[in-house]
Curated annotation (Swiss-Prot):
Its EC number is 2.8.4.1. It is an enzyme of class 2 (transferase). One of its GO terms (biological process) is methanogenesis. Coenzyme M binds at residue 365. One of its GO terms (cellular component) is cytoplasm. Keywords: Cytoplasm, Methanogenesis, Transferase. NCBIfam families: met_CoM_red_bet (TIGR03257). This is Methyl-coenzyme M reductase subunit beta. One of its GO terms (molecular function) is coenzyme-B sulfoethylthiotransferase activity. Its main location: cytoplasm. It catalyses: coenzyme B + methyl-coenzyme M = methane + coenzyme M-coenzyme B heterodisulfide. SUPFAM superfamilies: Methyl-coenzyme M reductase alpha and beta chain C-terminal domain, Methyl-coenzyme M reductase subunits.
Length: 434
């Protein structure tokens, strides 16, 4: 495990050789920068949802309906004309990078605002606000809505905003949550629901973990956690856990996939770390127990990060259930520490995250399944980008055991953003620009 790696895809196919990990940094890699920019400038619009809200008077969230104020507008049937006009309103200059695409036969739209709108703002919300405003104006103009009914159209698109901070009950949705929901500085790219990531990747576990790793590590860069010596530390984790560097993740999963356990994954990780000279025996106790030392601490952390994800793929894959991801994060690292005498992934922060995660995801509290958590959540934000990729992988492998399914929370996001190749297959995208 040198700082020059080979990048492999989710099928173990070599994509790019002799890659300097520094070229994988969000500050340098063009594909990662494109993913981040497209994340900020893109929103999904549920045209079928708008049509249903207008017809029923149901808007602004659950339990809210204004009887007698329905509008029978054929929104889906006019999707082409709506898309054309929305593009004219959203674009800054003729022929710029504005993009408006019909999805699912006109039931949804993907609106990508031009980069100039994002650059001209202090945050990323202009994609949502401009997109929602353009759709609202287009519908009112197209159907000749009078001032009396205009608020109904606005509420069908925008939901209960501005009475609520977010567009609750609205039909315009981005990958990112609103900035007001962030737990601290630089958390925007980490405030993405695991279900969203799994939906975008079409439930491909390794691509889900890769996309999540890109978001998480980019967030660490944004919050100042990858400065100086910590940059190498984070990039090694991104390369090996997120981008299958040297095919290590794929090989360990393949080795343990048939009848492996968390314990056998630990054996695979420790053996490879010893063979690569990353760790070596420091001293031997009278009992014969070996205490190891890390000859390269960030590389040992990368090994632990790969192992944590591999154990998740093996364990959650065997059960086809996401619920055991929290216990996998916990006990893989707990046993790894006992096996080596070295800290687990992220120096105990993944293990610590898993303790609270177990309680809040399905223990006696049990308020939500793993898929609704993110790297901004008060329970799961504590790891520096190494826990949530495992959660996204587990959710992708889930066969329908979650209380909050991918389809119920992230159907629109998956349909719209999953149509963008760089989101759906991020490993290939990153390797493709090297």
């Amino acid at each position: 495990m040198s700082d020059t790696v080979d990048i492999y895809d989710d099928r173990g196919k070599l994509l790019e050789s002799n890659v300097d990990i520094m070229s994988l940094a969000p500050t340098r890699n063009a594909a990662i920068q494109s993913i981040i920019m497209d994340t900020k400038r893109s929103v999904a619009v549920n045209l079928a949802g708008i049509q249903g809200a207008l017809a029923s008077g149901k808007m602004g969230g659950k339990g809210r309906q204004i009887l007698g104020r329905g509008l029978n507008y054929d929104i889906v049937g006019n999707a082409d004309a709506i898309a054309e006009n929305v593009k004219k309103l959203v674009q800054v200059d003729e022929g710029d990078d504005t993009n408006v695409i019909k999805v699912k036969g006109g039931k949804s739209l993907l609106i990508q605002s031009p980069k100039s709108r994002i650059i001209a703002g202090a945050d990323f919300m202009s994609a949502t606000t401009v997109g929602a405003a353009a759709v609202t104006q287009t519908i009112m103009d197209m159907f000749g809505t009078d001032p009396y009914d205009a608020p109904i159209v606005k509420s069908a698109v925008w939901g209960s905003y501005p009475q609520t901070m977010d567009l609750m009950g609205g039909q315009v949705q981005g990958i990112l949550s609103i900035p007001q929901n962030n737990e601290g500085l630089g958390f925007s790219l980490r405030n993405i629901m695991a279900n969203h990531v799994a939906a975008i990747s079409n439930r491909n576990a390794m691509n889900a973990s890769a996309l999540s790793s890109i978001y998480e590590q980019s967030g660490i860069f944004e919050m100042g956690g990858a400065v100086g010596m910590f940059e190498r530390h984070q990039l090694l984790g991104l390369a090996y856990q997120g981008l299958n560097a040297n095919n290590l993740l794929y090989d360990i999963v393949k080795e343990n996939g048939k009848d492996g356990t968390i314990g056998t994954v630990i054996e695979s990780v420790v053996r490879r770390a010893i063979e690569a000279g990353i760790i070596s025996v420091d001293k031997t106790a009278p009992s014969g127990y070996n205490f190891y030392k890390a000859n390269d601490v960030p590389k040992w952390n990368a090994c632990a990060a790969v192992g944590t994800l591999a154990a998740t793929l093996v364990n959650c894959g065997a059960g086809r259930a996401a619920q055991n991801v929290s216990s996998t994060l916990l006990y893989f690292n707990d046993i790894l520490e006992k096996e080596t005498g070295l800290p687990g992934c992220d120096y105990g922060k993944v293990e610590g995250t898993a303790v609270g995660f177990s309680f809040f995801s399905h223990s006696i509290y049990g308020g939500g399944g793993p898929g609704v958590f993110n790297g901004n959540h008060v329970v799961t934000r504590h790891s520096r980008g190494f826990a949530i990729p495992c959660v996204c992988a587990a959710v992708a492998l889930d066969a329908g055991t979650q209380m909050f399914s991918i389809e119920s929370t992230s159907g629109l996001i998956g349909d719209v953003f999953g149509a963008i190749p760089e989101f759906r297959e991020p490993i290939k995208a990153v390797a493709g620009v090297l």
